[in-house]
Amino acid sequence: MSIRSKFNKDEKKFVKFIDSTEEIIKHLNKSDSSKRSRLKLSGQQIDVLESNFKIDSHPNSATKSLLSNALSIPLKNIQIWFQNRRAKEKTARDGGRRRSGNAEIEDGEYEHGKMSYQAMCPFDFPPQERYFL
């Protein structure tokens, strides 16, 4: 029940060999605490991002870089903010409801993509006698 350490000087990597379940649990708990915390944006930063989103919901890399520098936010967070904001807008536009694969349409038919149920199945339902002659 010990931790053996091995240091490879060439690769400059530190490797731990864990021998017991207790040590594995301890190691996993340590990993959770090292998780990066969420970046909190100020109201002013959000206002700037929102105003830019109204102008262009898909900004180019130069615009994102300028926003990153001006707002002191990492570029990756700018990209993620725009991605999340586009998803939020799409959800609001769709009415906030999830769409299923099949949407019921008039006449009791079901639409799947662009092909209606009748187009997929050439038989009449319920089956008529002519099919069983």
From Swiss-Prot:
SMART domains: HOX. It is found in: Nucleus. Residues 86-109 are annotated as: Disordered. Signal peptide: none annotated. GO terms for molecular function: DNA-binding transcription factor activity, RNA polymerase II-specific; transcription cis-regulatory region binding. Residues 34-93 bind DNA. It comes from the Eukaryota. The keyword Nucleotide-binding does not apply. Keywords: DNA-binding, Homeobox, Nucleus. InterPro entries: HD, Homeobox_CS, Homeobox_domain, Homeodomain-like_sf. One of its GO terms (cellular component) is nucleus. PANTHER family: CEH-10 HOMEODOMAIN-CONTAINING HOMOLOG, HOMEOBOX DOMAIN-CONTAINING PROTEIN. This is Homeobox protein HD-5. It comes from Encephalitozoon cuniculi (strain GB-M1) (Microsporidian parasite). The gene is HD-5.
